[in-house]
Amino acid sequence: MERAIQGSDVREQADSECWDGGGGGTTSPFKLPDESPSLHEWRLHHSEESENKDNPLGFKESWSFGKVVFKRYLRYDGAETSLHRALGSWERDSVNDAASRFLGLSQIGCTYSIRFRGTRLTLSGGSGTLQRLIEMAIRTKRTMLQPTPSEREGNVSRRRPEGTEAFKEESE
């Protein structure tokens, strides 16, 4: 079951609420279920012993229509298959379908927000500009999640070929 948040200050609630929810319901703009890590998994990932603590487990995103907010945490590891999956977490049609339930004759605010690696980007507009907002959200999400060339090279160079340690010992 989808969880929608209603209240006077949507942004405050979006920041303070847990990022959970069910699979994409008929109202939700999201097509994938929430994948928030458990508290135990989160602590293990960010412990001092973890080698991956600089790499996030995933990213947070939300769509809001007026005072109704839909949120998701999705796993993302930077791999190409993970990128395609993350980019498909919502589509133009699913956002339009969800928005149509809340948009009436009056102009209301629509917002898309994404947070990845400590950076949050929020796009806002009125219901009359929803199609433009969706286009901008698609480009923004792709840009934020797409690994840079240096990150791609860094992932390759971090993997140590077999025999490297033995070679270092012999050369010293």
Curated annotation (Swiss-Prot):
An MF annotation (GO) of this entry: RNA binding
Listed name of the protein: RNA silencing suppressor p19
A single GO cellular-component term on record: virion component
Family: Belongs to the tombusvirus protein p19 family.
SUPFAM superfamilies on file: Tombusvirus P19 core protein, VP19
Self-association and partners: Homodimer.
Ranges of compositional bias, category Basic and acidic residues: 1-14, 150-172
Taxonomic source organism: Cymbidium ringspot virus
